[in-house]
């Protein structure tokens, strides 16, 4: 009888231990699975499909002006490209810098320093590389300054515009209704929550929100 009771309690303890292992295993496994799935979805949004990539022409990047504007050689001619859907702090003296400073109360030198950081990030990302340029469907081909308005992709499919926002070096530009605007807004939210890039200790992008874009 004693051996039966002993075996009974040993079985109960074993089952309880297995139940606890199963509970805590699922408790910690599910968030990891969700995190992995979220990361996979982020990568999927951040890349051009391989079949589209193979059919697209590549253009060499010749010069980078700031965090959202660069020059590429197209059909033997250098063209200025303004990346769609994003906006970075101004790096150079300009009327926009004056307006940004007046509107936000941030001094010009601080804004330019933030713009320099965004510029250096983009130089590292696309400098001396070849890129794929895609226009916004049913959108304007050029802006009022004559710059081509484009979505930009690296040869490995990386969506440059989105990556700049995801890494915290640009805001989502909200003034125009673009086909990929929701992706940019969501990327900005993630960058801010994770304090990436200029959303970190510098809090460099927060002043941009006051512009009402």
Q: Where are the predicted features?
A:
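Hydrophobic single-pass membrane-insertion segments
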Residues: 23-37
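Residue-level "edge-of-site" marker
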Residues: 139, 177, 204
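Extended substrate/cofactor- or partner-recognition/assembly subdomains adjacent to catalytic sites
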Residues: 181-213
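Residue-level signal for secondary-structure boundary elements
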Residues: 134, 172, 196-199
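N-terminal Sec-pathway targeting helices
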Residues: 1-17
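Conserved beta-structured recognition patch
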Residues: 144-194
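Electropositive
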Residues: 39-166
């Amino acid at each position: 009888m004693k051996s039966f009771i002993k075996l009974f309690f040993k079985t109960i303890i074993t089952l309880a231990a297995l139940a606890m292992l199963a509970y805590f295993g699922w408790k910690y496994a599910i968030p990891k699975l969700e995190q992995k799935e979220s990361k996979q979805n982020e990568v999927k949004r951040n890349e051009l499909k391989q079949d589209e990539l193979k059919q697209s022409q590549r253009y060499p990047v010749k010069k980078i002006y700031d965090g959202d504007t660069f020059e590429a050689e197209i059909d033997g001619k250098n063209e200025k490209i303004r990346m769609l859907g994003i906006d970075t702090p101004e790096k150079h003296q300009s009327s926009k810098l004056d307006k940004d400073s007046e509107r936000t109360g941030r001094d010009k030198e601080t804004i330019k320093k933030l713009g320099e950081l965004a510029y250096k990030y983009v130089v590292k990302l696309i400098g001396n590389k070849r890129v794929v340029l895609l226009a916004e469907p049913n959108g304007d081909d050029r802006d009022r300054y004559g710059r081509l308005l484009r979505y930009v992709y690296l040869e490995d499919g990386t969506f440059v515009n989105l990556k700049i926002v995801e890494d915290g070096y640009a805001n989502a530009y909200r003034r125009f209704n673009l086909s990929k605007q929701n992706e940019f807004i969501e990327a900005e939210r993630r960058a801010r929550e994770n304090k990436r890039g200029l959303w970190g200790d510098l809090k460099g992008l927060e002043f941009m929100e006051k512009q009402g874009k």
